[in-house]
Amino acid sequence: MVVKVGINGFGRIGRLALRRIQEVEGVEVAHINDLTDPAMLAHLLKYDTTQGRFKGTVEVKEDGFDVNGKFVKVTAERNPEDIQWADSGVEIVLEATGFFATKEKAEKHLHPGGAKKVLITAPGGNDVKTVVFNTNHTILDGTETVISAGSCTTNSLAPMADALNKNFGVKGGTMTTVHSYTGDQMTLDGPHRGGDFRRARAAAENIVPASSGAAKAIGLVLPELSGLMKGHAQRVSTPTGSITELVTVLEKHVTVDEINEAMKAAADESFGYNVDEIVSSDIIGMAYGSLFDATLTEVTDLKDGGQLVKTAAWYDNEMSFTAQLIRTLEYFAKIAK
């Protein structure tokens, strides 16, 4: 049985989600809703500066385009309640506009003629289950209609924080993500639509301090760490490829080797383990949601006998998150009731 998916918002994550779904059996994109002309959407799907050219075929048709020979309907409705997802057989919507990222707003897709379930591709708030696949996906029971996949940084941070807490106990911590610039920043100095003075500055010419909700969101993924972490971002002049640095105080005394061994033992399809001296361009396009870098682990002994432990994990803030998103989508569809 094929699960048909709709995508609302065909931006960076929406387009990469369609690419990733081409590699998944039993899931296909049947309908895209975006206010942009289908010919432009098809062009941006086919050609991508950071992720490379689409390996399949894309052909513009009336009212949509063919992707690898299969028709994808394209509509341009502003309001979710006006999108007739059911006409395309869509069961699950990927809400990727960024504008309908709360439970109340996302539920507008569930109207008569709409979809059955929604997966938000952004943090969704306290009343929505936030899923980082292979960290806490088993919190889902199949009855949920709206869930969130969190953010790219949350998916980078969560498995690393989880491994630290399970093995050594986390008393508290602070994280910094050195994050590539995104479409929410200005390419040249100019007014920012959200009123952010720093994001109003030229993205490729500056280090831009910015907020990050990942440290707060970690409490939605790992409730035992709720309120124990703070964090922020430093946006830098790379188009994709980011790294999360986490500094923690642990309950146990540790060594660098003990930390690295715990991370190696926790590795899976979502959480990789690296011992090479890599840089950000080396992880573009990778499928790990988070890649722990054992070469960057540090343990600092303090005068009072305590320790500061620094760990780091790479992530492609575009494709790493998308890979995790689609893993969550597959699971969400599989357990649906």
Swiss-Prot record:
Its EC number is 1.2.1.12. Belongs to the glyceraldehyde-3-phosphate dehydrogenase family. The keyword NAD applies. It comes from Lactococcus lactis subsp. lactis (strain IL1403) (Streptococcus lactis). It is found in: Cytoplasm. D-glyceraldehyde 3-phosphate binds at residues 151-153, 182, 199, 212-213, 235. The active site is at 152 (nucleophile). It comes from the Bacteria. This is Glyceraldehyde-3-phosphate dehydrogenase.
